[in-house]
From Swiss-Prot:
Span list, region Mn 3: 98-131
GO biological process, one term: protein stabilization
Subunit details: Associates with microtubules via the Mn regions.
Region (Mn 5): 166-199
One GO cellular component term noted in the UniProt record for this chain: centriole
Organism superkingdom: Eukaryota
Gene this chain is encoded by: SAXO1
Residue span of region Mn 8: 267-299
Keywords: Cell projection, Cilium, Cilium biogenesis/degradation, Cytoplasm, Cytoskeleton, Flagellum, Repeat
Protein name: Stabilizer of axonemal microtubules 1
Region named Mn 12: 367-400, 401-434
InterPro entries (UniProt xref): SAXO1/2
Region (Mn 4): 132-165
Amino acid sequence: MKTKCICELCSCGRHHCPHLPTKIYDKTEKPCLLSEYTENYPCYHSYLPRESFKPRREYQKGSIPMEGLTTSRRDFGPHKVAPVKAHQYDQFVPSEENMDLLTTYKKDYNPYTVCRVDPIKPRDSKYPYSNKMEYLPTYKADYLPWNQPRRQPLRLEHKYQPASVRFDNRTTHQDDYPIKGLVKTVSCKPLAMPKLCNIPLEDVTNYKMSYVAHPVEKRFVHEAEKFRPCEIPFESLTTHKQSYRGLMGEPAKSLKPLARPPGLDMPFSNTTEFRDKYQAWPTPQMFSKAPITYVPPEDSMDLLTTVQAHYTYPKGVPARSCRPAPQIRKSGRFEGSSTTKDDYKQWSSMRTEPVKPIPQLDFPTEPLDCLTTTRAHYVPHPPINTKSCKPHWSGPRGNVPVEGQTTYTISFTPKEMSKCLASYPEPPGYTFEEVDALGHRIYKPVSQAGSQQSSHLSVDDSENPSQRKLEVSA
């Protein structure tokens, strides 16, 4: 028999199983075709979907197999490629003649006798001249001053005369916006109105009344297997050691050259070509004077240096210093004048008054009342409670037959009103089997005959106190 869930048993469209976002009960990987879109928007079989705008594939593959030749292979045929012949050089045959060991320098440059050159040293000027030198620089001799008249300045005539009135130190903002006192404002807060209803709000909903908490299975925890050490001893052999065994061969020979090749038993001469041709000159022995034995003086020390004792000032007066005398700073004003100071005198600066625009508005002297147009002209009115025109509920209507000959009464066929099977906690004729991975409650029919009898229920079954209606929010 085919199993059904609440979604399939419902005939009124208000009951369905909770569609869980994750498969908390799932232990298999089965695709779920139910989604929020397919649940809220059912498909209509009378409406055909529109055709796709995707272009159709009108290209048909040819039955002839394609050749494996490209344009390059067809146009460019292979050529015979011969290996490049390497150039063979002639075998080197050493000559039997002896090398003369002569260079171009030895042939072109003949040796000359070398002698010591006296040092070029300027003459010592031990005796300076006492006469004063008369000199005139080239600039003063070639460039003489001209006697030209003084140029007149090209500046404009000074016509600005500052105002003699004292500046009052007031701004435009201070003149136009004087300081005003505090203004008493009227509160716009509405008055406290009495509450129309003192009944507390009920927080009981259909979800709280009809919600049944399902037991959650215990989470499966994977236990890791315990580590079991290997009982076979470690042989320290790798795949490389087992597959590649070393073969016995000849021992390696040393390629190190001999410490002293044969034929070089002669001692090494430490003379070079430079040492043979350029011998050291005979240097005379330095004359050294024997030191005089020190005899301490018997008189007292005069504390005079050699310069003070042997060199006196000429004419008895010490030499004057050529350094200019330091200038004494004066606290007074410097009275030196120049062309710029004579032509450009310091102006007597005065603070200029700001250019104020002519006031075109007459501002009121009274303080601002801080009232808007709405506050000034709006008159508050007491709220008026309007009467409701909604008719009173006369209670549930009975199954009264429709009177009158109308198209509805003629064509209407009364049918027996059946109650939705999903509104019962346990649908009659079905037994609960399991809860799906997506949260669907699966029910299995008891028998084929019993399910047909239980599907046609009367309206009076709702009055049975043993069966309580299950309200599920759609």
